[in-house]
């Protein structure tokens, strides 16, 4: 479990921001969202494959030269 110690005379907003940052670094929220509902193994594989294809196309697009505008 993630905990932070609130320092003396520290505003609540600053402590909340530090807490959110630590939660984000641990990846807890993304895991909670992923585990919120059951996902069939086939659906998970399909989602991961689609993400991999999208990453590949994005990488290829950044390597290609832009089209000529004349």
Swiss-Prot record:
UniProt signal peptide: none
Q: Which domain of life is it from?
A: Bacteria
Q: Which biological process, per GO, is one annotated for this protein?
A: translation
Nucleus recorded as keyword: no
Give coiled-coil spans as residue ranges. none
A molecular function (GO) term = structural constituent of ribosome
Q: Which NCBIfam families match?
A: S21p (TIGR00030)
Tell me its family: Belongs to the bacterial ribosomal protein bS21 family.
Q: Which HAMAP family match?
A: Ribosomal_bS21
What is this protein identified as? Answer: Small ribosomal subunit protein bS21
Source species taxonomy: Bacteria, Pseudomonadati, Pseudomonadota, Betaproteobacteria, Nitrosomonadales
Its encoding gene is what? rpsU
């Amino acid at each position: 479990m993630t905990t932070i110690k609130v320092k003396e005379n520290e505003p609540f907003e600053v402590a909340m921001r530090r807490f959110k940052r630590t939660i984000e670094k641990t990846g807890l929220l993304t895991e909670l969202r992923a585990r919120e509902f059951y996902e069939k193994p086939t659906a998970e594989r399909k989602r991961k494959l689609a993400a991999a294809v999208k990453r590949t196309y994005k990488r290829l697009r950044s390597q290609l030269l832009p089209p000529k505008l004349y």
